[in-house]
Amino acid sequence: MSDPKTIAQLRATIADLMRWFEGEDLRAAVIGGVAAGLHGRPRLTKDVDAVVFSDDAAALVASAGSYGFATRIDDALDFSRRTRVLLLRHHSGVDVDISLGALSFEAEIVDRAQVIDIGGLAIRIATPEDLIIMKALARRPEDIADIGGIIDVQHQLDVDRIRFWVREFSSVLEMPEIFEDLERLLQRRKL
């Protein structure tokens, strides 16, 4: 997504997402590639990811249409009950994945979110620390690259918070390699 048309579509999607969050008083924040690009190395992405602290996917779907969003699969509500992800599409054609937050950590993500102004567009995004935590759990190559980009750009990270949450999730999931991978990355950057 590097041509002006697709950048404009992404911007329009984010603008409507912010209007939706504010208009419906949703506890929400942008996460994923958009947020990682704003906190770290800029990169383009094909979709927008957000976390909304809500259990009511039906109410979200009902209000989404007023802001230019529709479900992108036929059984979106059933899918969201099984996966806690609501799959939407903006009228511009950009896909939006809404994670339905329920964990205390997800509540913290939205409560700690920051507003960043990009060319007059105020975007509510997860903090750099919370993005690193989420991306450490995902463990995909692009997530590891995003972590590196965030660490390289952000020089006032709360590394204790990052270590605490990744250690907690690593323990609960019985996957010590999650914490070990993060620790190697932090040590390489002398954090």
List each language-model region with its residue ranges.
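Compositionally biased terminal segments of proteins
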Residues: M1-L191
